[in-house]
Amino acid sequence: MAKKSSIEKNNRRKKMAKNAAPKRERLKAIIADRSKPMEERFAATLKLAEMPRNSSITRVRNRCELTGRARAVYRKNKLSRIAIRDLGSRGLVPGLVKSSW
């Protein structure tokens, strides 16, 4: 089980990234638009740099919904490999069977 503080920090980052996404997109569009004057694009770059780092979606980590584990998390299930294995061995994941050959 991951530390509660790590899980909460990631949740705060998710919320902050979601709230700041439209503003970041507007600023990035201004920066990428070559028809705008250089001063306006540079001002947009400075505004983007002033925004909190945690407002970037890149800072959000995929975590397991059950354990909070940050590594080996399957995006489709939002579960770590360990959690899937545990649930699968208990027969709680439909269609998941232990392989044998």
Curated annotation (Swiss-Prot):
Under the heading SUPFAM superfamilies, the entry gives: Glucocorticoid receptor-like (DNA-binding domain) (SSF57716)
- Could you tell me the Gene Ontology terms of the biological process aspect for this record? translation
Q: Which domain of life is it from?
A: Bacteria
Q: Where is the signal peptide?
A: none
Q: Which Gene3D superfamilies match?
A: 1.10.287.1480
GO CC annotation, single: cytoplasm
UniProt lists compositionally biased (Basic and acidic residues) regions at 1-10
> What is a single Pfam family found in this protein's UniProt entry?
Ribosomal_S14
GO MF assignments: rRNA binding; structural constituent of ribosome
Using the UniProt annotation, give all residue ranges assigned to the region (Disordered): 1-25
Query: Keywords for this entry?
Result: Ribonucleoprotein, Ribosomal protein, RNA-binding, rRNA-binding
* Family listed: Belongs to the universal ribosomal protein uS14 family.
What HAMAP family does UniProt report for this protein, alphabetically?
Ribosomal_uS14_1
Please describe the quaternary structure of this protein.
Answer: Part of the 30S ribosomal subunit. Contacts proteins S3 and S10.
Q: What does this protein do?
A: Binds 16S rRNA, required for the assembly of 30S particles and may also be responsible for determining the conformation of the 16S rRNA at the A site.
- Which NCBIfam families would you find in this protein's record? PRK08881.1 (NF006477)
Please state what the protein is called.
Answer: Small ribosomal subunit protein uS14
